Amino acid sequence: MGLALILTFTVGACSRNATPAPAKPHVFVIVMENKTVEQALQGPFTASLASTYRVAANYSGVGYPSLPNYLALTSGQTFGIRNDNYYVLPAGGIGAQLTATGVTWRAYMEGMAHGGCLENTYPYVTHHNPFAYYGGKCPSNVVPFTDLAADLKGNTPMFGWITPDVCHDQHDCSVSVGDAWLRQTVGMITESKAWTSNGLLFIVWDEDDGSTENRVLSMVISPGKSHKVSKQGYTHYSLLATIEDTLGVGRLGQAAGAKAMTDLTAN
């Protein structure tokens, strides 16, 4: 009888003292285009983010032109592609991975009409939408950018990928135009409960202006994290590894051997 009481008390005490596992943060990614670090920082809003939050100061793209970088960010490999043509690649990538593991996600494509992800209708271009390549079609998770505002006010997915159109991403238009778009879009995200509840926003440029170093600006925007600059060598594979680790899924492709950006995501 006495032993039973002791066991009951012990189990009850352990149950009361158990600390629940912390909830996974919402993760957002915005991919900008074709600027060196110095060029990107000419945007006053971008510069203010870099001086307030966290920056990977030794971050590089994985190749040229755009498409290999987008594939690296979403699958951990480039498939040997060195152009922006359309290919039907094996089904997979982070989207399929998240779906298989029950993690909600959406990819927001600015300029894309509903159901038209394979059609290049300016200012939307397919080669800035990596999800269109895996399996030769877009899953229903790929939606127009205009859906983002409502999602941020309602049922926000755990992972949100955002591709601006080719003007707002600074590919075809000036740094100032893209910087103004970032001000509006980042403001919308950082006002949401998904971000204020320990969310993570990564802003990265896919490649530089064609130099041999291919160093690009990569920033981590998260509430409650003080300014920090990391000199660790990172690439798009590092960012993919960081996203996958944060969301609790396995690492794809070359992300498996990459160093995660934990010095920038930890408190």
Describe each model-derived feature in a short phrase.
Residues 11-13:
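C-terminal motif of bacterial Sec signal peptides marking the signal peptidase cleavage site
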